[in-house]
Amino acid sequence: MRALAYFKKGDIHFTNDIPRPEIQTDDEVIIDVSWCGICGSDLHEYLDGPIFMPKDGECHKLSNAALPLAMGHEMSGIVSKVGPKVTKVKVGDHVVVDAASSCADLHCWPHSKFYNSKPCDACQRGSENLCTHAGFVGLGVISGGFAEQVVVSQHHIIPVPKEIPLDVAALVEPLSVTWHAVKISGFKKGSSALVLGAGPIGLCTILVLKGMGASKIVVSEIAERRIEMAKKLGVEVFNPSKHGHKSIEILRGLTKSHDGFDYSYDCSGIQVTFETSLKALTFKGTATNIAVWGPKPVPFQPMDVTLQEKVMTGSIGYVVEDFEEVVRAIHNGDIAMEDCKQLITGKQRIEDGWEKGFQELMDHKESNVKILLTPNNHGEMK
């Protein structure tokens, strides 16, 4: 089938030769992909990989899949075929996919050394995002959403009301990342929040905070194009490059108490945002790291936390419930459909996905949020 695939380190290109998926276990579903967003993880896989993808000549530890594999994990689509034990969806349903693989999926891969092994402790406790065997559809486990079709277990399928357009539905995955993070932080309705960075994850964090009833949201960002994007979402923007060493003091003063924010979310992952995420908090405030950091350590003063009983935590990925809650939030208007559409800065066919998708994002990072690719199964590019 047609796909934009990862062949080896530094080689992503369109092909007609990715095998079409087949149902192999009774609980699997085949989806005709409508839209799939390009994620920062996809870019990192090209620039720095293989990270999640198997190395050239090797197989993935979970599924035994080998390259080439279609990329893409932020997908929406229409159910094309269901296994005999599938009860969650039917042919023709609109759906999104929780692309994370865990112990719950080991039954799908009889050639894996982990086949039908006992679930890890994290999975037994319901934290599948922390699974010992964690992996992602479209990032090495099996081929993903930059293809005509994808196959996944019904456990990972989330039905989407047809009132939600399928291009907007493709944003449910990145929104679920930030929904999970805001839940992890213990966010309470009516609280104030600081978002550090207005890239794709920062902007998704804004939408989630608005949906959860934040009383005040301030976004700290220095790039003018991203500042404009954040303003379009109706939040206050602070540019720390204009205030130097007084930035934290000024930020704290922007809250109703003039004493700092109840919650902060680091979506940038650099030393200055790490420090700000803690120091801009009020007493008993919570700082949550969503950013993916490199291996370099950063200085940390424990008394920044201890003296005012602040909390520092982190969040990774999502679970199925996050997807279900995001879909409900969009459907009932807590997350505005028009706000979601603001995040879509490009749409391309998978045939053009490398030049007009990946290269566009790498060359013009600050002027793009989310570029969606489609195999055009149902005339999506009309």
Curated annotation (Swiss-Prot):
Binding-site residues, Zn(2+) 2: 103, 120, 123, 131
Entry's family note: Belongs to the zinc-containing alcohol dehydrogenase family.
The enzyme's E.C. designation: 1.1.1.4
Chain sites annotated for binding Zn(2+) 1: 39, 73, 173
Subunit structure: Homodimer.
Matching Gene3D superfamilies: Medium-chain alcohol dehydrogenases, catalytic domain, NAD(P)-binding Rossmann-like Domain
Species annotation: Saccharomyces cerevisiae (strain ATCC 204508 / S288c)
Name of the featured protein: (R,R)-butanediol dehydrogenase
